[in-house]
Amino acid sequence: MSADNVSSIDPEKERISRERREKLAKWRAKKALMDSQNELKKETVPLEVKNSKITNNENDSTSRSKLLERQHKLQEWKRKKREREEEQLIKEQENTKETSSHSKKKNKKQNRGSQKRQITFDDSDDETTGESKDSFDKSEIVVEKSDMSGSKNNNEDDPLEAYMKSLVNGGQPLNHKIGENILDEDGDDNSIEEDDEFSNSESDEESSRYKRISKAKAKKKVKEIKFTIKDLEPFPKSFYSEPDEVKLMTDDEVEEMRLSLGGIKVKGKHCPKLITRWSQLGLPTDIMNLITKELKYDEPTAIQSQAIPAIMSGRDLIGISKTGSGKTISYILPMLRQIKAQRTLSKNETGPLGLILAPTRELALQINEEVEKFTKQDRSIRTICCTGGSEMKKQINDLKRGVEIVVATPGRLIDILTLNSGKLISTKRITFVVMDEADRLFDMGFEPQITQIMKTVRPDKQCVLFSATFPNKLRSFAARILTDPLTVTINSNNLVNENVNQSFYIEDNENDKFNRLVNILDGFYKVNKNITSNSEEREIDEEVSDKKIIIFVSSQQFCDLLYSKLENFGYFPYTIHAGKPYQERVMNLEKFKTTTNSILLCTEVLSRGLNVPEVSLVIIYNAAKTFAQYVHTTGRTARGTHKGDAITLLLPDELAAAYILKRALRERELSSIDPQMVEDMKQMSERFESGMKEGKYKLSKGFGGKGLDNLDTKREEKQQEEKHKLDKIENDESTPSTSYKTTDNASSSSEVDSVTIPKLEFTIDRDKNIDSTISFTAIVNVNDLPQLVRWEATKNTTLMFIKHETGCSITNKGKYYPEGKGPTSNKDQPKLYLQIEGKEEKDVLLSIELLEQKVREGIKKVEYQSIKSTKY
C-alpha cells in the first residue's frame, strides 16, 4: 500500500470516526432521557403504593426513609454519569488525533514486514509485535475493527445503528453484549450496567417474587362476594299449596302416617304436612308421566313424601335417610320448579341457577343422568356435569354458552371458579344449592372448598343437605350455612334398607374365607342359571336373568390380589379402585352395568352413590369397621323397590364388625342363620362391648381422613391408651385390693357423670356498624369458673376451635380476680370475660354452645382429679 493511499484513507477514517462520535453522543443523550423517564415511572409507582400505605399507617417511617435514600442514590448516580460522559468526550478527541499518526506508522511497518500475506483490519488482532500492542489500546482496536468491517462489507448492519433503531422504535436493546463491545471504554459501560442493576434489580426482583407468591396463593382461592340489597334480584321460593285432603288431616293422623311410612321424624317449626300421592304436588302432566310410567315410581317414598313439600315451601332442609330411598328426586323436582319460575338467562349471563355438589365423580355423573331424564324434553333448562378427570375444555365451552344447573365435585368447581380471574362463570344468580351425601363430603376433607364456594353465593339462597348420617361436624356447618332449617329423619334407629336380607359367615382364616367366597359365587350363579335356562322365560322376565354381584375389599392391593385368585377359579370380575386411571374406572363401571350377571370387585370408593338396580348380592369380604360404612355398603343392593342380599365374611378377631352386625341384623334374619354361628357372633360382640367399657376398644364413627383434626384425635387416643396401660400397671401392683378399686372406679365414673354442669352467664347485644350492617356481640363471664375449667375455656386451642367452627371472633378481655374480690372503681379492669363477635346471632349462640362443651370437659377433669387425689 503506497503513502498516497494511506493519506487518502486517513481523512475518510477521520470522517467515519467523527460520525460515530456524533451518533454515540446522540445515543447517550437518548439513553439518558429514557433512563430518567424509566426512573421517574419507577419512582411514581412505589410512591403511590407508599402513599396508600402511609394513609393506612402514618407512622411508617421506615418505608419513607428507604424511599428518600433511594432517591438520593439515584441523583448521585446521575451526577456521576454526567461527569463520566464529559471526561469520555475529551478523551475521544485526544485519541482521534493520535489515531492518524499511529495508523501511518502502522501501515508503513505492515508494508515493509508483511509482503507474504495481505493485511486487513480484521487481522490486526493477530499481530504479535510489541509496537502494535504498545501503540493501540483496546478501545482503538475495537473501533478500527468495526470501521473496517463496515467498509469491507456494506451489507452488514452496524451494531450501533441497529441498537439506536431499537431505541427509536420504543423497544428494548437487541443484545446487551453488542453495547458492551462498542462502549467498553474506561469501564463506562460496566458502571452503567452496575447503576442500571442498582436502580432496577432490587425493586424488580422483589416485586416479581411477591407477585409469584401471591399469584400461587390466589390461584385456587375463590374471591368472596359482598352482596348488597340492590345486587340481589328477587326470586320466588314457595310453590307448594296443600290440597284439601292434606289440609283436613289432623295432627294425630299426620303422626300416624309418618310412623307408618318408616318412622319419619321432623325437627323444626312450621313443617308442612306430608303427601301420600304424586298428584298432591300439582306437577305438570309430562313430569307425572315420566315419574309414574317411565320411572315407574307408583308412590312417593318416605323421604320424598315429607321432603318435597318442605322444599317446595321454600324451607332449607336437612334430609337424613337410608341409601336408595329416592333422595335425588326429592331435590330435583323443587329445583326444576324454582328455575322455571325465574327469569331466563340473558346473552351475557352464564348461570347457573342451581348447584348440586357431590363427593365423587361417579355420584356426580349419576345425579346428572337423573337430572337429564327430567330436562331432556325441556330445552330451556341446560345441565352440565363438572368433575375431575374429564376434559375441561368442553366444560368451559358449555359454561360460556350458559347453563341452568351445574352438577360438580367441589375440587373441579373451585378450578372453574378461579379460571380467568373468576370471570368464566358468575355465581350471583345461584338460588338453589344441594349437597348430596354431605357427610361424605366432609369425611373426604371438602369442608374448606365448600366454605369458599358458599361465600360466593347469595345469602338468601335455598340450601338443602341430604345424607345417610349426620355427624356433629356436619351439624355445626349446617347451623352456619342454613337458615332455620327443617330436619327430616327417616327410621334413624335402623338405617339398613328393609329390602336387604343380611347374613354372615365366620371363618377361621383367610383361606377358609376365600373358599367360602368361591362357594357363594358358585351357588349363586348355579341358581341363577337354573332360573334362566329357558330362553323364552329369559325374554319374559329380564330382571330375573340379570343378577349382578359387588365384592367390597379394604385396599387396592387386596383388590388386585383377590382378582388374581378369582381368575384362577374361572371368574373375571371388573375391578375399580382409586389406583386405576379414571378412564379405566369409567370403562369398567360401564361394562359392569351392561354385562349380564357380571361381578364388580372394588374398594369403598363405590360404597356410596352407585346406583345399579340389577345388583342383587353384595359381599363384604373385608368387614366394615364403621356403622356408616356398613350402611352404605349394603345399600348398593335393593335399590328402589328391588330386593337383595348382603353377606359379610368375618374372621374371629374382627370384633368391631361383629358388634355392628349384632345391632344391624333383624330377628327374622338371625333365625335363618346357623345358631352356632349366631352365638359366636354375639360372643364376639360382647367382648367388644366390654373392651369399650374398659377403654381397650373404640368404635370408629366416620370414614376417617387426614389433617390436623384427625392428628389431634389420634393423639388423644394414644394418650388414653397410655393412661389405660398405666392404670392397669397400678392395679397389678396392688392385687389384694383389686375388687375394691374396681368398685371405686365405677363409683368415680358415676360421680363424674352425675356432675351438674353450670350454664355460662352471658349477654348478647345487637350492634349497628358505621356501614349500616348489623353485628352481634356476646359477653361470657369466665372469671368465677374453677381454675381448670377457666383454663380449658380460655386456652388458645379452644378459642381457635370455636373460631374455625363458627367463623366468629373470640378474645380474652378483662382481668382475673380471686373469689370475693373484684374491680373497685371504673378505672379498674372488669372481671375476666370472653367477647364473641359475629355477623349472625345464630353463629354467636353456636359459639357459646361449643364453649359450654369445653367447660363440661373441664368440669369433668376437675372432678376426676379430685376423686383420684382422694382415692387412696
UniProtKB/Swiss-Prot annotation:
Pfam families with a match to the protein in the record: DEAD, Helicase_C, KH_12
Positions with biased composition (Basic residues): 102-115
Keyword flag Hydrolase: yes
EC number: 3.6.4.13
Region annotation Disordered: where it falls in the sequence: 1-21, 34-213, 708-752
Composition-biased stretches (Polar residues): 734-752
Protein name: Pre-mRNA-processing ATP-dependent RNA helicase PRP5
Enzyme class: hydrolase
CDD domains associated with the record: SF2_C_DEAD (cd18787)
Statement: the UniProt record of this protein carries the keyword Transport: no
Gene that encodes it: PRP5
Classification via SUPFAM superfamilies: P-loop containing nucleoside triphosphate hydrolases (SSF52540)
